Amino acid sequence: MRVFVARQPIFNRKEQVVAYELLYRESEENVYSAKDGDQATTDLVINSFLNIGIEKLTEGKRCFVNFTESLMFSNLPTSFNPKQLVIEILEDIPITPALISRCKELKKMGYMLALDDFYAINPQDEDLLEKLMSYIDILKIDFLKTTRMERRTILQTYGCRGLIFLAEKVETRKEYKQAVQDGFQLFQGYFFSEPRIISGHDLSTHFYSYYELLNELSKEQPNIKRVTEYIERDLSLSYQILKFLNSSHSRLSQKIESIQQAIMLLGFNEIKRWIYILSFKDLSRKGHSSKHEIIKISLIRAKLCELLARKTSRPQPASYMLIGMFSLIDTLLHREIEEIVQELPLKDEVGQALLGHQNDYYQMLELVKLIESNNWDTCSELGNQLDKEEAYECYLEALEWCHNLMDAK
């Protein structure tokens, strides 16, 4: 049996990513099996996390992990470094003296504890809830299930305890601002990917240099001298192209004597693809953490689209990278997607998919969105050509590829 893992970022008030919630499921079912299967599931989760690597999944940040009642009393929580893990106690776990004792034990070991979906908790004994609260660090409150008045009541009731309040399923900027005003410190949801209307936002100067180069590369017969000139006038770009050539041609028998020679060895299509990647990486150095996170998601989607296209033997698999890469470009630039598509030298089918036309590129992007949200049941409906195990390996490869790319100097 295989455990599939995805992640969702958690932000602070400065919109910096401070943690990730790890979402995991069994390969075929969305629930854990009976008690006898809990230990097997525990072993699977441990093995999967060790094989993938917590560092790779969370990039050195804390990870939030949901625990069922049985798993709370297993060895799974203590298999992680306390500095890496926040233990989420599910709202349907009965509050008992045994649970309180277990939480006390975990707190002594240095673990942070969070109560998931706090408003949904309906304790039979208020005194037991009070005792449990003395060991809780974080209260997670679901924005989709509560009103603003209900949330404010919770914050007023428990605000004096020094707890951290996390607003989850925050889907819009309006909800995010509301949560900040009401006193929440952490935020989870896709509010950060919602376009904001802000005047003066545009692409960086470097991006326009890349764009100029992309325009030339998109012609039926690009002028190699002009392409060479564009690259040679940018020292960083020249260095990156040569570095990429060296890494992609490990058995290169000849020494590179000029940028033009490097271009001829790589080919226009490969250079064009790499320029798209470099332009996004350059853009990620500017702006705050939420923009950085959007770029990471875009790059992961880009690589995953390409890998899945290769796995399913689609023609021109490298072209599928573009649909993932530009899937959030309107959010990054705070502009209408229609304007952006008109300006960029994109393949017609890719541009149409970005505009919502349900062609094969659009379907691929939808499949990737399902994978990143760990929605494997619907994935099987969209991607019937693909084995779940293979798709998951592609997801992990895309995560690692993005991590290596963003960390490269």
From Swiss-Prot:
Domain HDOD: 203-392
Start and end residues of each EAL domain: 1-209
Top-rank lineage group of the source organism: Bacteria
InterPro entries linked: dGMP_Pdiesterase_EAL/HD-GYP, EAL_dom, EAL_sf, HDOD, RNase_Y/CdgJ
PROSITE patterns: EAL, HDOD
PANTHER family reported in the protein's UniProt record: CYCLIC DI-GMP PHOSPHODIESTERASE CDGJ (PTHR33525:SF4), PTHR33525
Name the UniProt record assigns to this protein: Uncharacterized protein YuxH
Gene for this chain: yuxH
